[in-house]
From Swiss-Prot:
Gene3D superfamilies the UniProt entry points to: 6.20.200.20
Superkingdom of source: Eukaryota
Alphabetical keyword list: Basement membrane, Extracellular matrix, Repeat, Secreted, Signal, Synapse
Keyword RNA-binding in record: no
Protein name stated in the entry: Brorin
Function: BMP antagonist which may play a role in neural development. Promotes cell adhesion.
Region (Disordered) location: 37-126
Main location as per UniProt: secreted
Naturally occurring in which organism (per UniProt): Mus musculus
Length: 324
């Protein structure tokens, strides 16, 4: 056993020696190639080592650069917002100037030419500033539509100016006025009253004038011409007057010749159907006749021929009579 192990060790060592020799023989001519292969790698390795050494500094520089860019972007944004707010304030100022009568100042700044970019604005804001900004001029209030001539003169409706102390009519339907330093002094004259039948009034003059009068009357739902007479009832007669009013009169009935007059539907005054008569107590006595009311009393109705005069009460006389 010891001899076999020794032999095995010797064989192993001899094989190892041979292997080493072969390796040395094979590797000896490749030394310059390895050097040449390692030569270009060394600068790259040095660069990597240099980059690894310089990387913290560069990272810090990049961090600072990014922070600077972020801060500069914020500065651009803040400056842009300030520029936008400045333009809004400027537009409000222009509107205020226009409302105060300084429309000329606002008109000078309505258009901003190209290239007039505010300093420090970001590119987006610069593009907005370079573009033409058309600002509409606000309309002036009504009180500024015409110049104020108070203390200098007076103006009529057509815009004509009159000097102080001059008489003029402010409008086509206005009365004459006197121009004073305090303004027009107008006095309304006393105008005549219009006709009650006037149906068309002309107000183009200082005093209104009647241009047309109605030539008819209206009465109880009917229309009548001027000066026309008409009968409303058997006892009423009416007339359309020139002033448009209707005047009516009631017929005056004469005294009846009887004590029992009768009214007929188509007649205004009563008539005596029984002729002239009078009363003897409750009895009716015809005129001119005697009537015996009882055995001892005779009554007659007084009547004068041609005059139709009668007494209401009959004349009665009582005679002596025999009692049966």
């Amino acid at each position: 056993m010891p001899s076999s192990s020794a032999m095995a060790v010797g064989a192993l060592s001899s094989s190892l020696l041979v292997t080493c020799c072969l390796m040395v023989a094979l590797c000896s001519p490749s030394i310059p190639l390895e050097k040449l292969a390692q030569a270009p790698e060394q600068p790259g390795q040095e660069k990597r080592e240099h980059a690894s050494r310089d990387s913290p500094g560069r990272v810090s520089e990049l961090g600072r650069a990014s922070r600077d860019e972020g801060s500069s972007a914020r500065d651009w944004k803040s400056k842009g917002s300030r520029a936008l707010s400045g333009r809004e304030a400027w537009s409000k100022q222009k509107q205020a100037w226009a409302a105060q009568g300084g429309s000329a100042k606002a008109a000078d700044w309505q258009v901003r030419p190209r290239g007039d970019t505010p300093q420090g604005e970001p590119p987006a804001a610069a593009q907005e500033a370079i573009s033409l900004e058309l600002v509409p001029t606000p309309e002036l209030p009504e009180e500024y539509a015409y110049p104020d001539y108070r203390g200098k003169g007076c103006v009529d409706e057509s815009g004509f100016v009159y000097a102080i102390g001059e008489k003029f009519a402010p409008g086509p339907s206005a009365c004459p006025c006197l121009c004073t330093e305090e303004g027009p002094l107008c006095a309304q004259p006393e105008c005549p009253r219009l006709h009650p039948r006037c149906i068309h009034v002309d107000n183009s003059q200082c005093c209104p004038q009647c241009k047309e009068k109605k030539n008819y009357c209206e009465f109880r739902g009917k229309t009548y011409q001027t000066l026309e007479e008409f009968v409303v009832s058997p006892c009423e007669r009416c007339r359309c007057e020139a002033n448009g009013e209707v005047l009516c009169t009631v017929s005056a009935c004469p005294q009846t010749e009887c004590v029992d007059p009768v009214y007929e539907p188509d007649q205004c005054c009563p008539i005596c159907k029984n002729g002239p008569n009078c009363f003897a107590e409750t009895a009716v006595i015809p005129a001119g006749r005697e009537v015996k009311t009882d055995e001892c009393t005779i009554c007659h109705c007084t009547y004068e021929e041609g005059t139709w005069r009668i007494e209401r009460q009959a004349m009665c006389t009582r005679h002596e009579c025999r009692q049966m």
